[in-house]
C-alpha cells in the first residue's frame, strides 16, 4: 500500500520520560492536597482520578507521544489507566507506570502523588506493595520540588535520607524493578 505524503511530515512516535498524568501543566500549589487525596480514596474518588488520568494519557497520544514513563500519580491511577489501555478498554500511549511515588514527611508530593516513608523498613514495604500492584518502576522523591517550595532555591533541598533511599532501591532491585528519582540538586 502506498500513501501519498506529499506536503506532509512523518515522524516516529515520541517518548515522554516524565509525566504526572494528574498535572495540567498549569502552576499549582500543593496546599492541602494530601487531605484531598484522603477524601478521594474511595470507589467514586478513584473513578474520578482514573477518568482525569485517562484524559491526560489520551492527550499525550494525540500530541504524538506513543510511550510515557509516569513519574507518580495519586491512588495508583496510572497503573489502572495502563491496564485499561493494555486491555483495549481505553486508548492511550504505552505507559511505564510507577504508581504512587515514595517520599518522606514534608517531602515533594507527600500525600498527593507520593506515599510517605518514615523509616527504611517502611520504604522497603512500600516498594513491595507497589510491586504487588504491578508497578513497572519505583519513583523516589529525594529532594524538594518546585510546587512545594516555600522560598526561592528550596526545591533542591535534600529531603530523603540515604538510608531510606538505599532501602527502597535495594528492595526494588531485589524484585527486578528499576528505580527513578526526583532530584533537583547535586546534594540529592
Feature map (PLM): residue ranges:
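Active-site gating loops and adjacent loop-to-helix segments of metal-dependent hydrolytic enzymes
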Residues: 23-49, 91, 99, 103-111, ...
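Divalent metal-dependent hydrolysis catalytic cores, especially in the metallo-beta-lactamase
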Residues: 52-78, 92-103, 135-149, 177-178
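Histidine-rich, glycine-flanked metal-binding segment
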Residues: 1-11
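Residue-level marker of alpha-helix boundaries and capping positions
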Residues: 47-48, 72, 117, 159, ...
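Mid-domain alpha/beta scaffold segments of enzyme catalytic cores
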Residues: 70-114, 121-126
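Histidine/acidic residue-rich metal-binding segments in metalloenzymes
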Residues: 80, 121-188
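Metal-associated gating/positioning segment near the N- to mid-region
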Residues: 9-84, 108
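Divalent metal-coordination and catalytic microenvironments
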Residues: 7, 15-18, 64, 95, ...
Amino acid at each position: 500500500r502506498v500513501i501519498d505524503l506529499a506536503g506532509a511530515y512523518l515522524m516516529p512516535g515520541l517518548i515522554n520520560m516524565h509525566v504526572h498524568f494528574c498535572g495540567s501543566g498549569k502552576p499549582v500549589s500543593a496546599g492541602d492536597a494530601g487531605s484531598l487525596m484522603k477524601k478521594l480514596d474511595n470507589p467514586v474518588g478513584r473513578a474520578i482520578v482514573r477518568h482525569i488520568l485517562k484524559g491526560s494519557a489520551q492527550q499525550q497520544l494525540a500530541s504524538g507521544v506513543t510511550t510515557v514513563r509516569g513519574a507518580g500519580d495519586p491512588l495508583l491511577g496510572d497503573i489502572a489507566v495502563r491496564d485499561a489501555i493494555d486491555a483495549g478498554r481505553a486508548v492511550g500511549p504505552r505507559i511505564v507506570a510507577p504508581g504512587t511515588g515514595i517520599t518522606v514527611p514534608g517531602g515533594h508530593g507527600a500525600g498527593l502523588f507520593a506515599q510517605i516513608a518514615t523509616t527504611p523498613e517502611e520504604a522497603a514495604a512500600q516498594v513491595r506493595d507497589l510491586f504487588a500492584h504491578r508497578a513497572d518502576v519505583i519513583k523516589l522523591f529525594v529532594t524538594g520540588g518546585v510546587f512545594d517550595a516555600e522560598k526561592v532555591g528550596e526545591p533542591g533541598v535534600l529531603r530523603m535520607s540515604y538510608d531510606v533511599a538505599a532501602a527502597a532501591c535495594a528492595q526494588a532491585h531485589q524484585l527486578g524493578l528499576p528505580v527513578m528519582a526526583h532530584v533537583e540538586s547535586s546534594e540529592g
